[in-house]
Swiss-Prot record:
Residue positions binding Cu(2+): H16, H99, Y182
Cofactor(s) of this protein: Cu(2+)
Name of the protein: AA9 family lytic polysaccharide monooxygenase C
Entry note: cofactor: Binds 1 copper ion per subunit.
UniProt keyword Disulfide bond, yes or no: yes
Source species: Thermothelomyces thermophilus (strain ATCC 42464 / BCRC 31852 / DSM 1799) (Sporotrichum thermophile)
Amino acid sequence: MKVLAPLILAGAASAHTIFSSLEVGGVNQGIGQGVRVPSYNGPIEDVTSNSIACNGPPNPTTPTNKVITVRAGETVTAVWRYMLSTTGSAPNDIMDSSHKGPTMAYLKKVDNATTDSGVGGGWFKIQEDGLTNGVWGTERVINGQGRHNIKIPECIAPGQYLLRAEMLALHGASNYPGAQFYMECAQLNIVGGTGSKTPSTVSFPGAYKGTDPGVKINIYWPPVTSYQIPGPGVFTC
């Protein structure tokens, strides 16, 4: 395995992905509609960069004026594709299978979802899927037609939010920088929330460090049997 790992990395060097659209109530809102999609599908590797919040340089993102209405308590689906122009949903249309790691999702309450950059505090994690029985969260998305299901907590306050959906690829993470962070932000108007619970929050950048065991890790050798997902715990009602 020590010999094969560099070959795996070389073959997967250009295999990237984009959170291209959001599905709500079984209806896909459209590519780039309410989601700030980039013109390039590459990763962010510097966890101290402002681009770790909602993507950005070196991957310029396109503004969108749409704010998607979502009801608290429902499950939305972040749809991932290799490129914005990718129309299929086979595993190779999502992300290279070598890109193993967790999936995560965060929310941030904002005054205006179309203008807030996402940089700074206010983020709380609402979903994570790491390593379970030898299968990674990214593998479940890749083999599930690019569908990343995210439940919106019913107990949060109504209002406008940014939804940050993320896939983390660890095939090159034995050194830092090396882990590949893929994320985009959707612009939401969440209705029907009770506001009965206030989440603890973290900042982007700031939530991850290059020394975190879930960021700097060799997933090939010795074989990984457990994995610590980076960032805070998942907020629950």
